[in-house]
C-alpha cells in the first residue's frame, strides 16, 4: 500500500494547517487521487492492522439500508457509537440514501438495486452512479456523508469503481474507506458476472488531524508487506444475501495496530 503511504507523506510535508469543525485542527490538501488494481490483491493496509470485521459489517449494514447502530452492536461493531442518539439512531445517512432516497413525489428510490439492473442491462452507461449526498436531508443526519458519491465503469468484462470523498480523515477513515469500496466493487462484480478492475479514490479535503501527526510518522517508518487476498463465497449471486461468513481474508501479514483518537 505504498499508494496510501505516499498520500500520508504528501499531506504531512505539503499540507496546509487549518482549523476545522471539531476544534482539533488539521493539515490538509485539496484534491488527491489514488488508484488500486483489485486483481493485484485486496487493498487493506499492512503497515498497521485494521479491524476487518468492522469494515465488513458496516458495509453490510449500509446495504441493508439500516441507520440504527443496534445491528452493528449485535455484531460487536462500535465505530458509529459516538454519533448515535440515545435510541441508536443516526438519521437518514448512507444506508437510507443508498436504498431509500426520498423523491419529491413520495416515492423512495433504491439506488443500489437500480445500479445492479443498469450494470446488467446497460453496462456502457455513464449513469452508473449512487449518491449519499442529499442536501435536503443533511440537517437530519448525525454526520453528513464523507464518502458521498460513487460511479461504476464496465470495460473488457471488468468492473471498476470511482469514489468521490468530500472529507477524508487520512489516518483513521481512509484505510477503512479504501477496503470498504474495494469490497463493494468485488461483491457487485461477482453478482454481475464480471471480473474486478480498479478502485479509484478521489479525495476533496484530505486531512490529517494534528493529534495524528506522530502516529502518521510512525506508520511511514514501516515497510509495507505484500497485499492479502479476499476470497468471496462464489455461491452468492444476490448482493443483498451476503453474510459476514461469505468473506475470507487470506495471507494478511499486518504490522501492529497504531492507536489514535477520533475527532467527533
Swiss-Prot record:
- Give any GO molecular function from the UniProt entry: thymidylate synthase activity
InterPro entries given for it? Answer: Thymidate_synth/dCMP_Mease (IPR045097), Thymidate_synth/dCMP_Mease_dom (IPR023451), Thymidate_synth/dCMP_Mease_sf (IPR036926), Thymidylate_synthase (IPR000398), Thymidylate_synthase_AS (IPR020940)
Q: EC number(s) in its UniProt entry?
A: 2.1.1.45
**Segments traversing the membrane:** none
Binding, dUMP: 21, 126-127, 166-169, 177, 207-209
- GO terms for cellular component: cytosol
- Primary location: cytoplasm
Residues noted as binding (6R)-5,10-methylene-5,6,7,8-tetrahydrofolate in the record, renumbered to the chain: 51, 169, 263
Reactions catalysed, semicolon-separated, are: dUMP + (6R)-5,10-methylene-5,6,7,8-tetrahydrofolate = 7,8-dihydrofolate + dTMP
Alphabetized, the UniProt keywords read:
Cytoplasm, Methyltransferase, Nucleotide biosynthesis, Transferase
Matching entries from Pfam families are given as: Thymidylat_synt
Pathway assigned to this chain's UniProt record: Pyrimidine metabolism; dTTP biosynthesis
Q: Which residues form the active site?
A: 146
What subcellular locations does the record give?
Cytoplasm
Q: Name one GO biological process term.
A: methylation
Entries under PANTHER family matching the protein: THYMIDYLATE SYNTHASE (PTHR11548:SF9), THYMIDYLATE SYNTHASE 1 (PTHR11548)
Assembly, in brief, is: Homodimer.
The family note in this entry says:
Belongs to the thymidylate synthase family. Bacterial-type ThyA subfamily.
Q: What does this protein do?
A: Catalyzes the reductive methylation of 2'-deoxyuridine-5'-monophosphate (dUMP) to 2'-deoxythymidine-5'-monophosphate (dTMP) while utilizing 5,10-methylenetetrahydrofolate (mTHF) as the methyl donor and reductant in the reaction, yielding dihydrofolate (DHF) as a by-product. This enzymatic reaction provides an intracellular de novo source of dTMP, an essential precursor for DNA biosynthesis.
Q: Which HAMAP family match?
A: Thymidy_synth_bact
**Full protein name:** Thymidylate synthase
- The gene it comes from is thyA
Amino acid at each position: 500500500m505504498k499508494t496510501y503511504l505516499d498520500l500520508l507523506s504528501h499531506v504531512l510535508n505539503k499540507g496546509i494547517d487549518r482549523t476545522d469543525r471539531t476544534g482539533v485542527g488539521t493539515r490538509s490538501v485539496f484534491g488527491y487521487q489514488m488508484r488500486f488494481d483489485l486483481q493485484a490483491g485486496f487493498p487493506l493496509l499492512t503497515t498497521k492492522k485494521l479491524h476487518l470485521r468492522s469494515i465488513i459489517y458496516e458495509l453490510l449494514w449500509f446495504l441493508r439500508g439500516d441507520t440504527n447502530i443496534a445491528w452493528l452492536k449485535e455484531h460487536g461493531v462500535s465505530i458509529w457509537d459516538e454519533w448515535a442518539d440515545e435510541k441508536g439512531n443516526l438519521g437518514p445517512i448512507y444506508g437510507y440514501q443508498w436504498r431509500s432516497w426520498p423523491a419529491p413525489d413520495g416515492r423512495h428510490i433504491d439506488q443500489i438495486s437500480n445500479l445492479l439492473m443498469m450494470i446488467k442491462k446497460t453496462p456502457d452507461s455513464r449513469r452508473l452512479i449512487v449518491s449519499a449526498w442529499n442536501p435536503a436531508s443533511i440537517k437530519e443526519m448525525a454526520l453528513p456523508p464523507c464518502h458521498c458519491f460513487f460511479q461504476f465503469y464496465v470495460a473488457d468484462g471488468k468492473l471498476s469503481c470511482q469514489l468521490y470523498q468530500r472529507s477524508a480523515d487520512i489516518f483513521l477513515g481512509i484505510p477503512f474507506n479504501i477496503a470498504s469500496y474495494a469490497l463493494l466493487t468485488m461483491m457487485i462484480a461477482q453478482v454481475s458476472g464480471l471480473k474486478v478492475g480498479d478502485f479509484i479514490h478521489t479525495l476533496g479535503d484530505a486531512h490529517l488531524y494534528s493529534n495524528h501527526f506522530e502516529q502518521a510518522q510512525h506508520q511511514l517508518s514501516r515497510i509495507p508487506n505484500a497485499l492479502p487476498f479476499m476470497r468471496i463465497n462464489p455461491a452468492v449471486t444476490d448482493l443483498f444475501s451476503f453474510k459476514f461468513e461469505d468473506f475470507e481474508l487470506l495471507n494478511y501479514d499486518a504490522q501492529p495496530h497504531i492507536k489514535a483518537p477520533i475527532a467527533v
